[in-house]
Every structure is written in structure tokens, then in C-alpha cells.
Amino acid sequence: MMHADTALGRWMTFGVAILVAACGGGGGSSSDGVTAGIDRGGIVTATGSITGFGSVHVNGVHYVTTGATITLDDNPGTESDLRVGQVVRIEGRIEQDGVNGTATRVIFDDEVEGPVQSIDLGNLRLVVLGRTVQVSTQTSFGDRISPRSLEGLAVGDRIEVSGRVATTGVVEATRIERKNAQSSVEVKGTIA
């Protein structure tokens, strides 16, 4: 014989499960570092590499940036300050089509900035302020690096690296730019 409390509990559990399934999700992240907010057609926060302009293209979505606040390393900026390969956080809206949106904020902050300590051309790696940086064929290099590859850098060069941090702690570079010798140094990480 089933007690009323048990039956009510099962119905409540079933009801909650149906409601959760009906919501359809929309949040979460994927392996490429994409972080999404609410659902398509709603307010979103997305993080990813810039893949193009004509506004800003991130994670397959074309965000119109007219009127958006753009911030680079905590300083005001403009769309012309942004570069392909930089990992940015975008706050705004995505249209129902899932490929168009409007950004209200575009925020860039590098992963590490400082002098190159070592370069391993064979493994496409370098070390900046103790952080290992992995380069790939997808990494974009700035105009001041010639050739536009790891070979265009030397120990002692000051660089800015944008990318994603792997679970191993290695920075997977999406963009590397040479900076002036007097530029600031910056490193992010977990305090042990």
C-alpha cells in the first residue's frame, strides 16, 4: 500500500523533472571555451576567440557592437583595438536565429603578458613569467612579429598572450602580440 506522502513526493519529483526538461537549458560551456548564458533570443554572456569583424564574430555569432562598451585590459577601447584571435567576453543578446546578436559589452583581458623566458620550436611552446604557452597552427600573431610564427620571437621579447587555459595549466594561445619593452607584466593563475 502506498502512503499519501510517498505518492505526493513521487508526483512532485516527476513534475520537477518535466519542468526542467521543458526549459531546454541554454547555459553551460563547451570544450572550445565557449560560455553561454540564457537561451537564444535572450540575454547572454559568451566567451570565445574573435574570428572576424564587421562588428565582432565570436563562436559563430555575429555581434553588432554599435553602442557597446569595449574594454581592453581594464581600459576603455574601440572595436578597432580588437584583433582576430583575442579571447573576449561578450555581454548582450542573441537573436532567435542563433547567428546574430547585439553586444552591450565586449571585454578583453590577456592571459599572460611579459618577457619570453624560453622557446621550444620543436614542441611549439614558450614560457612567459613561468607560464607555459602552447602555440598551434590556429594561433594568430600580431603585425610586429615577423615572420608571423613562433620563429618571429626571441628570448627577452615582451609579449601579450590571449588564449584558454587547459586543465593542465598550459595556456593554449589563440593570439600573441609583441609589446613595447616598457609594457607592464601580468600573469594570472591560482595561488597555491
Could you tell me what each predicted segment is?
Residues 3-5, 11, 15, 20-67, ...:
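Short, flexible, surface-exposed loop segments at domain boundaries
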